[in-house]
């Protein structure tokens, strides 16, 4: 077995042996890290191995929690009690200072437990209030930092496996303090030349500490100096702690090189490796011999047993008890100063750093000293060694000099600490047993009384024992090992310490396979062993220093009387420099201002981006105005002179808007930046105009109060500008003959006195409510009351008068329309240019309650322009033209003349040129019933009983009689409708169908008894309760957006789960990392948001996969996922992500601050790949974290990119500079690159971004490749047409293989405007057409420039038009309509879009005699207000003109009724019915499509379809719009499908 192990070891260490024919290394070279010393237990004594325990660990929880207060005394109190005493007492054994520091050197070779552990755990030492050293101000909150040491990670998990500390050096006496504890460390010390250790400029000194050699570089507590400069490279990490330890390191450094030189002379053919290894083994052997056989007996006054050979089963591991025993006993002998002398026994003065001279080197001011002025040369070091050899150490007792007790080097935070208190904490950290347990375990006699600890001390100074006993509450069993062992020491270490140390060295010697006396390891011959045994430290000093041996005593560890060079006197603190006081440092000192500036700069990123965006928007707007100027000839041609720039104040909660004020004869005109007229103020006598001028804040405000209108408040830049306008106004008003009154108010009072537009609107709303309450007998509570304590402005509601502009606005018409002029002139009886309450009421009573004769007479008077009692044919044409103006000039003059001639001819007035009122009334004879029963259907208003009676009477009319208007039936109760709605009832003619006379005029044949559709709108009672409206609004919101809510809930649940998972991990499960102990809130916030941000910024890419979304919309997934809301979801994700990004940044700001004030020992645990704890303590500054780390720098750049992208992507700037948005949004590529780099540095955790990013990135990349494969084909524009209202019609080639469906959209880029800027537009062409067409409205710079570019070119039109890039189609079509013989298309709001192409397609196919299965289409559009479908008028008109076979029937439902007393809707309702009867066209659109007011009655409508199309067994119903509407359609289809008749197949899409 032994042979096999030896063979394996030989193979293992073969790499250490140089190759060659002649190999002078004939032995097994010892490893530097201590491994494989014992061939059975390879790890014994290796670097990083656990310490051995002689006694079981003593922890509070039995595992790792140390004991402490209140069970044990305060360490500082205990230190002051035990170790305080006088200095200058000589060693009773005459031990020298050299022996003391040689003991420290031996300890550094054997053990190191000072290195802080990870995660960082602190056992800070609380300082008692009023401590003269550390708390002289009696603050009571002072603590000395103490960090627990490293432990074996395999321990500390259970009471059976308590925490064991780890030794950071080898546990062998193998010269690791000289050569290092690893091969790499040794290589860093070597010169690789002639076997020597590397030296600096002076061959007597090693080179300075530098990377990769990582020496402990603690700051100098006396001067604060730090850094590696002045620290030498030794094998011991802390070899530079004191000049005295440093001198011993230099001694062995020089001794090795001395031996290497000697061997090189003896063996000139040896290589560097042979020389180094021979010198190394000789130096180690000498070191072992001196430590064990010379120093240890002088230290213990005991000798080790005779060496009997290597004992492989003996564990040589260092014990925790040995660490405390050896170091603490040595600390009692450290003097306050150290002498220096030369070989001739001259004790020289020491030059201090302040240039003063003292008799000795003060210990407390020498810790971690760099480049001390008295230690600049090898001779200085020699003098220090000689001085330590002649100086008697302090007495071996329990007293520590103040240099050790109060001025021991601490961390940079506290430059000083208490050595004994720190050792006590270290013992508790190591789990050392109590004093009594240790004695019992080591076989020593038990101690039962405090006096028995040290009888000599009890006799000489019993107060120390008594005070110590008091601290432990007289309980000897709680006395700790360290103070107990210290108290029992007298002359020599006490029995406990002596036993521990002796036992440890026996195990070290006998268990070391490489011990120099082991003749079986092949290291030395017996002769060489004898030479080594005869070598003493005196021999080493003589050889290195090159002095006469008589200058030193034979045993340099003890000085006896008669030895050479006695010390002048025993040193005490007297006559020595005072110790530098403790300094408390703030790591963040001097960084506050810069840190604040940095954070402020980061916060300014959005502001800088806003400024940039504003500049770009201004430049783009300037170009936009220049382009628009060419299309404003009608406005520019007006002579607007005297214009002045100002800001119009619109109200307290409204933003100010820039305006231009122009003074013209008889009026003041206010326009905006685009020269669009915002307001015209008429100046007519005898008006009285009031000026109110501000008297403070720069006197820049002007209030112009105009009677019967809202006020105009203008803000100017300078008082001079305001004054100039006032002067011009005075002149203009005097010329107009108007009186002026001026006064001044403070600006705040002026704005409170102003009547704003919003206040005027509320005033008019009350006006209209009470107006209709008078006409329709509406409940006063519904109309709105006027309390007595209401403001003056509200009480004036009934006395206010409407201007012409307000009257026109209330009708939704233009002030210059002829209809408005006619009605206003008729109503304005006093001719003052305003309508009073009474004037409006008089004309409204006629419209709402008058007889047919009164209503026709009113219309007659309106259009009797010359007032001669006759309406000429021209006036009749003007009357119709007034309606045509309202309907956007939908009929030409020829068509209008034809209609008038036809109406005159049918009434028998073809020979008349003028009509009397009787003739005019005769022409309207067919509408008597409609005029009679014209009532205003107001939600919440009961229908008059007379109407109900008429309904009841109408139900008994036979089939061959004409029943009243179904509008009357619509007002009956639901039960009445259900009982009276019979097939016979459905045969009554409807007011929604043109009257028989009108149909005959246009050649339409009417069958008296054919089934008709029930299309009258269903109206509901309007609930005015705010609670009811809120509940209904919430219910509609949930109903309309249930898919959106579901998807958003799932998405945010995932994001929230990711946040909570990371937050929980770092709050509760990451204690082993230690980062939460440093920055809990910051790390939880930053890591939680980072997880959510990674998820959001990854999956936001899917919302831009247009091709994928287009495909998925046509699958069943569209019923669950609102793919149409992808862009809105994109914005929502982006908004949430930027909020989380800000929170993420805030979290890291907190982290950076805390990292900037955390010592290096903590940071090295948190970031082991970034920091190494070298004792320097000083953390990196804040700017290092921000700008010199990959995550920090990329994070700052990411914030800048996000600021730019988000600002330019805002709705405001996107409208003003789409190109800016387009270009900045392409920064997303750089954004994702930086995100990957940002997270891949693994500063805190392993990269996780790729987990979220990979799948969306692949999908997005594939989607982009699909787009790139087609959008780079140049498309020629066939036709470009400039239409009114800034609309550009483009018709261009259809690419080969381009298939699309109705309602889909494309993205185009104009090559003349840039090949990378794409804009989305809906296709307005039908799928059957050979070309594609778009209708583009000039609403921004790009579309305006597009309109300019496609203006009429010269030469060949097709060749001259700039070409396009095309990408698409996107979206989903609605194409199953052709599978049904009868189809019903129901569009709600914008949901009508997909049906426009369907209508065109159907009409086209029917017009070319194409075989089409679908024979009839009913198109129903439900919209809130008539203004929402003005853009569709041209398409529907085209359908009507081409629909020669009457395939399409269009019905439009306006859901906004007069329940809100909206005059516009009410009057247009009346005018619509009148216009429909007269001209068979809608007043709003000029179409033959029927316009209804209310909601469509789907169930009666579908029932009537079964009567109209009895032969059709299956009808397709297609609905697009809000979910509430499609749900009602679905419900109606389900109810009808319960009958065994026609089946209604419903297909719906929600918008």
Curated annotation (Swiss-Prot):
Residues given in the record as Ca(2+) 2 binding sites:
864, 866, 868, 875
Q: Which residues lie on this side of the membrane: Cytoplasmic?
A: 618-1044, 1102-1148, 1210-1226, 1270-1551
Q: Where does Ca(2+) 1 bind?
A: 828, 830, 832, 834, 839
Q: Name one GO molecular function term.
A: NADH oxidase H202-forming activity
| Keywords (A to Z) from UniProt | Calcium, Cell membrane, FAD, Flavoprotein, Glycoprotein, Hydrogen peroxide, Membrane, Metal-binding, NADP, Oxidoreductase, Peroxidase, Repeat, Signal, Thyroid hormones biosynthesis, Transmembrane, Transmembrane helix
Quick one: signal sequence residues?
Answer: 1-21
Per the entry, what modulates this protein's activity? The NADPH oxidase activity is calcium-dependent. Peroxidase activity is inhibited by aminobenzohydrazide.
Read off the CDD domains from this record: dual_peroxidase_like, EFh, NOX_Duox_like_FAD_NADP
Q: In which tissues is it expressed?
A: Expressed in thyrocytes and tracheal surface epithelial cells (at protein level). Expressed in thyroid, trachea, bronchium, and to a lower extent, in placenta, testis, prostate, pancreas and heart.
Region feature Interaction with TXNDC11, mapped onto this chain = 956-1248
Q: Which residues form the FAD-binding FR-type domain?
A: 1270-1376
Tell me the segments the record calls region Peroxidase-like: 26-593
A Pfam match = EF-hand_7
Residues of this chain annotated as glycosylated in UniProt: 94, 342, 354, 461, 534
Would you name any one GO CC term? apical plasma membrane
Extracellular-side segments: 22-596, 1066-1080, 1172-1188, 1248
Supply the InterPro entries for this chain.
DUOX_peroxidase (IPR034821), EF-hand-dom_pair (IPR011992), EF_Hand_1_Ca_BS (IPR018247), EF_hand_dom (IPR002048), FAD-bd_8 (IPR013112), FAD-bd_FR_type (IPR017927), Fe3_Rdtase_TM_dom (IPR013130), Fe_red_NAD-bd_6 (IPR013121)
Reaction catalysed by this chain? Answer: NADH + O2 + H(+) = H2O2 + NAD(+); NADPH + O2 + H(+) = H2O2 + NADP(+)
Q: Which residues form the Ferric oxidoreductase domain?
A: 1087-1269
Per its UniProt entry, what is the enzyme's top EC class, as one word? oxidoreductase
Compartments annotated for it: namely: Apical cell membrane
What is the recorded membrane topology of this protein? Multi-pass membrane protein
An annotated GO BP = response to oxidative stress
Functional description taken from the UniProt entry = Generates hydrogen peroxide which is required for the activity of thyroid peroxidase/TPO and lactoperoxidase/LPO. Plays a role in thyroid hormones synthesis and lactoperoxidase-mediated antimicrobial defense at the surface of mucosa. May have its own peroxidase activity through its N-terminal peroxidase-like domain.
Q: What does the subunit comment say?
A: Interacts with TXNDC11, TPO and CYBA.
Q: What is this protein called?
A: Dual oxidase 1
């Amino acid at each position: 077995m032994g042979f096999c192990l030896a063979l394996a070891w030989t193979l293992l260490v073969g790499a250490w042996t140089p190759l060659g024919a002649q190999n002078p290394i004939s032995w097994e070279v010892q490893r530097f890290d201590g491994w494989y010393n014992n061939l059975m237990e390879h790890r014994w004594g290796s670097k990083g191995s656990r310490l051995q325990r002689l006694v079981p660990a003593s922890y509070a929880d039995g595992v790792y929690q140390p004991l402490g207060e209140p069970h044990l005394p305060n360490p500082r109190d205990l230190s002051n009690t035990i170790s305080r005493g006088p200095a200058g007492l000589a060693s009773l054994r005459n031990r020298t200072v050299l022996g003391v520091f040689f003991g420290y050197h031996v300890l550094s070779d054997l053990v190191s437990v000072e290195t802080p552990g990870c995660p960082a755990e602190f056992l800070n030492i609380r300082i008692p209030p009023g401590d003269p050293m550390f708390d002289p101000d009696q603050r009571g909150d002072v603590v000395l930092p103490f960090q627990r040491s490293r432990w074996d990670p395999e321990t500390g998990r259970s009471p059976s496996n308590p925490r064991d500390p780890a030794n950071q050096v080898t546990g062998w006496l193998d010269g690791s303090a000289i050569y290092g504890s690893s091969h790499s460390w040794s290589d860093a010390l070597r010169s690789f030349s002639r076997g020597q250790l590397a030296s600096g400029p002076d061959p007597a000194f090693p080179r300075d500490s530098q990377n990769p050699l990582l020496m402990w570089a603690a700051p100098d507590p006396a001067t604060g100096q730090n850094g590696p400069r002045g620290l030498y490279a030794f094998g011991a990490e802390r070899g530079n702690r004191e000049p005295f330890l440093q001198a011993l390191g230099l001694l062995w450094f020089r001794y090795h090189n001395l031996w290497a030189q000697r061997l090189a002379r003896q063996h000139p053919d040896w290589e560097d490796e042979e020389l180094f290894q021979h010198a190394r083994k000789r130096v180690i052997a000498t070191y072992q011999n001196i430590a064990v056989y010379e120093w240890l007996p002088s230290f213990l006054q005991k000798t080790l047993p005779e060496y009997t050979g290597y004992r492989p089963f003996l564990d040589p591991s260092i014990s925790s008890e040995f660490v405390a025993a050896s170091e603490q006993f040595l600390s009692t002998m450290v003097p306050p100063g150290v002498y220096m002398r030369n070989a001739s026994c001259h004790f020289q003065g020491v030059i201090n750093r302040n240039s003063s001279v003292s008799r000795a080197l003060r210990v407390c001011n020498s810790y971690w000293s760099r480049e001390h002025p008295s230690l600049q040369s090898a001779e200085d070091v020699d003098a220090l060694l000689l001085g330590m050899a002649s100086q008697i150490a302090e007495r071996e007792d329990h007293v520590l000099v103040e240099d050790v007790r109060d001025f021991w080097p601490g961390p940079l935070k506290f430059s000083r600490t208490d050595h004994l208190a720190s050792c006590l904490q270290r013992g508790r950290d190591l789990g050392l047993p109590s004093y009594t347990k240790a004695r019992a375990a080591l076989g020593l006699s038990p101690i039962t009384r405090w006096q028995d600890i040290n009888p000599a001390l009890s006799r000489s100074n019993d107060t120390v024992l008594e005070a110590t006993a008091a601290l432990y509450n007289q309980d000897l069993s709680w006395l700790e090992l360290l103070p107990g062992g210290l108290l029992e020491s007298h002359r020599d270490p006490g029995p406990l310490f002596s036993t521990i140390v002796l036992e440890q060295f026996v195990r070290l010697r006998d268990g070391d396979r490489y011990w120099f006396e082991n003749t079986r390891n092949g290291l030395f011959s017996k002769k060489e062993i004898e030479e080594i045994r005869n070598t003493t430290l005196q021999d080493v000093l003589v050889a290195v220093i090159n002095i006469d041996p008589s200058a030193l005593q034979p045993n340099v560890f003890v000085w006896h009387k008669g030895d050479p060079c006695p010390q002048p006197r025993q040193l005490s603190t007297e006559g020595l420099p005072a110790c530098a006081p403790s300094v408390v440092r703030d790591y963040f000192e001097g960084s506050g201002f810069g840190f604040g500036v940095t954070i402020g700069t980061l916060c300014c990123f959005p502001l800088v981006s806003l400024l940039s965006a504003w500049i770009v928007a201004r430049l783009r707007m300037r170009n936009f105005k220049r382009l628009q100027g060419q299309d404003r000839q009608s406005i520019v041609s007006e002579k607007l002179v005297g214009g002045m720039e100002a800001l119009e104040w619109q109200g307290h909660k409204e933003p100010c808007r820039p305006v231009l004020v122009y003074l013209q004869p008889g009026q003041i005109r206010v326009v905006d930046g685009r020269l669009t007229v915002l307001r015209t103020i008429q100046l007519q006598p005898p008006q009285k105009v009031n000026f109110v001028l501000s008297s403070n804040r720069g006197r820049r405000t002007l209030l112009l109060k105009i009677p019967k209108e809202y006020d105009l408040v203008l803000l100017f830049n300078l008082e001079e500008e305001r004054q100039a306008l006032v002067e011009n106004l005075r002149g203009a008003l005097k010329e107009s003959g108007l009186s002026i009154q001026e006064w001044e108010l403070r600006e705040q009072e002026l704005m409170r006195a102003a009547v704003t537009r919003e206040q005027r609107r509320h005033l008019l709303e009350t006006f209209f409510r009470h107006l209709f309450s008078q006409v329709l007998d509406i409940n006063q509570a519904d109309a709105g009351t006027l309390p007595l304590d209401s403001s003056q402005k509200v009480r004036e509601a009934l006395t206010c008068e409407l201007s012409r502009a307000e009257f026109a606005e209330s009708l939704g018409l233009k002030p210059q329309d002829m209809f408005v002029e006619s009605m206003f002139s008729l109503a304005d009886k006093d001719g003052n240019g305003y309508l009073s309450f009474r004037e409006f009421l008089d004309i409204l009573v006629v419209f709402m309650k008058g007889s047919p004769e009164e209503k026709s007479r009113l219309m007659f008077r309106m259009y009797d322009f010359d007032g001669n009692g006759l309406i000429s044919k021209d006036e009749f044409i003007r009357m119709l033209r007034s309606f045509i103006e309202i309907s956007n000039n939908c009929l030409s003059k020829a068509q209008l003349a034809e209609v008038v001639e036809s109406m005159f001819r049918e009434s028998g007035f073809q020979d008349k040129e003028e009509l009397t009122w009787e003739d005019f009334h005769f022409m309207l004879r067919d509408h008597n019933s409609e005029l009679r029963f014209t009532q205003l259907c107001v939600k919440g208003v009961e229908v008059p009983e007379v109407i109900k009676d008429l309904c009841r009477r109408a139900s008994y009319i036979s089939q061959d009689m004409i029943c009243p208007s179904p509008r009357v039936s619509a007002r009956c109760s639901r039960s009445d409708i259900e009982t009276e709605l019979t097939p016979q009832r459905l045969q009554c003619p409807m007011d929604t169908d043109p009257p028989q006379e009108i149909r005959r005029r246009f050649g339409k044949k009417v069958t008296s008894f054919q089934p008709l559709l029930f299309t009258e709108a269903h109206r509901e009672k309007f609930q005015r309760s705010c609670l009811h409206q809120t509940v209904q609004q919430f219910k509609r919101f949930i109903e309309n957006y249930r898919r959106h809510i579901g998807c958003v809930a799932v998405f945010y649940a995932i994001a929230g789960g990711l946040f909570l998972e990371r937050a929980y991990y770092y709050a509760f499960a990451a204690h082993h990392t230690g980062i939460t102990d440093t920055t809990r809130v910051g790390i939880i916030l930053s890591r939680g948001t980072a997880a959510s941000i990674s998820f959001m910024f990854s999956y936001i890419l899917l919302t831009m996969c247009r091709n994928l979304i287009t495909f998925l919309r046509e699958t069943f997934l569209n019923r669950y996922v609102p793919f149409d809301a992808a862009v809105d979801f994109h914005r929502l994700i982006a908004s949430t992500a930027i909020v989380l990004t800000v929170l993420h940044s805030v979290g890291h700001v907190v982290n950076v601050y805390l990292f900037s004030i955390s010592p290096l020992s903590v940071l090295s645990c948190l970031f082991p790949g970034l920091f190494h704890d070298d004792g320097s303590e000083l953390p990196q500054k804040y700017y290092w974290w921000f700008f010199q780390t990959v995550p920090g720098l990329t994070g700052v750049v990411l914030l800048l990119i996000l600021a730019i992208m988000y600002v330019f992507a805002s709705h405001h700037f996107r409208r003003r500079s789409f190109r800016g948005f387009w270009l900045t949004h392409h920064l997303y590529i750089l954004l994702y690159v930086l995100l990957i780099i940002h997270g891949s540095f693994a500063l805190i955790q392993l990269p996780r971004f790729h987990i979220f990013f990979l799948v969306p990135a692949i999908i997005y990349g594939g989607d982009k490749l699909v787009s790139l494969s087609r959008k780079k084909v140049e498309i020629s524009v066939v036709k470009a047409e400039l239409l009114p209202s800034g609309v550009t019609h483009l018709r261009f080639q259809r690419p080969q293989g381009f298939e699309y469906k109705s309602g889909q959209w494309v993205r185009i880029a104009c090559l003349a405007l840039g090949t990378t800027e794409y804009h989305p537009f809906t296709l307005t062409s039908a799928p059957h057409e050979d070309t594609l067409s778009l209708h583009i409205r000039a609403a921004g710079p790009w579309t305006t420039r597009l309109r300019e570019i496609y203006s009429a070119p010269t030469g060949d039109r097709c060749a001259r038009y700039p070409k396009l890039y095309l990408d698409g189609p996107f979206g989903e079509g609605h194409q199953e309509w052709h599978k049904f013989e009868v189809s019903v298309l129901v569009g709600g709001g914008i949901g009508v879009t997909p049906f426009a192409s369907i209508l065109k397609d159907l009409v086209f196919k029917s017009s070319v005699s194409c075989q089409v299965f679908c024979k009839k289409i009913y198109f129903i559009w439900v919209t809130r207000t008539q203004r929402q479908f003005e853009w569709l008028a041209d398409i529907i008109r085209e359908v009507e003109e081409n629909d020669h076979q009457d395939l399409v029937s269009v019905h439009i439902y306006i859901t906004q009724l007069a329940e809100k007393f909206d005059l516009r809707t009410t009057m247009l309702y009346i005018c619509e019915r009148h216009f429909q009867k007269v001209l068979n066209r809608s007043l709003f659109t000029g179409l033959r499509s029927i316009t209804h007011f209310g909601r469509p009655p789907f169930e009666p409508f579908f029932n009537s379809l079964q009567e109209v199309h009895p032969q059709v067994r299956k009808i397709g119903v297609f609905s697009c719009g809000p979910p509430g509407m499609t749900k009602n359609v679905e419900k109606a289809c389900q109810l009808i499908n319960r009958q065994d008749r026609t089946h209604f197949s419903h297909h719906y899409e929600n918008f």
